[in-house]
Amino acid sequence: MSTPRFSTNDVTVVFFLGGPGSGKGTQSANLVKDYGFVHLSAGDLLRAEQVREGSQYGELIREYIREGKIVPMEVTVALLSNAMAESLATSPPPAGTKARFLIDGFPRKLDQAVFFEETVCPSELVLFLDCPEDVMETRLLKRGETSGRDDDNAASIRKRFRTFVETSMPVVDDFKKKDKVVWVKADSSVEKVYEEVKAGIEARGLQAR
């Protein structure tokens, strides 16, 4: 059994999950500003890595993203772990406080959660944005008009919904059994959702900084 790279005495990890278009990006920005989280998006790290000069994973990641499939977890976890180490080295938290990492869009499957917690760091909680598919689809199609992202089209969006329900919901359900989920309804205004998010994480002992 390997020892995790980081100790929960030094870092607090919150997994941030929700279907595509549930509003994680917007809420993440608020949490960074008010709670001192470092925001790590698994998707952003993968997208950056696929175009990084000399990347050993670039071609592999491109292929998986194009097919709408989940990238092998060893790759994603390595990128997250390295990003955490880099953040701690370049901008450590204030003395006497723990670094806070908001890991967005990860874990996408149960085995990823287990692998991350065994090798990188056990998580504090899972923040889950629960949003109806029709609301998410409308948001994503609107975003697709300007985002230039290959996967913001109707067919790809529905495929992503299916993948999320089949693979990521079991993660949420598993953490719920351990009483580690802050479950927020995410189909109202950004402000209202954020109020619920704040209330949920503060009830778990994470205060604003």
Regions found by a protein language model. Give the residues of each.
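Glycine-rich phosphate-binding loop of ATP-dependent small-molecule kinases
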Residues: 1-209
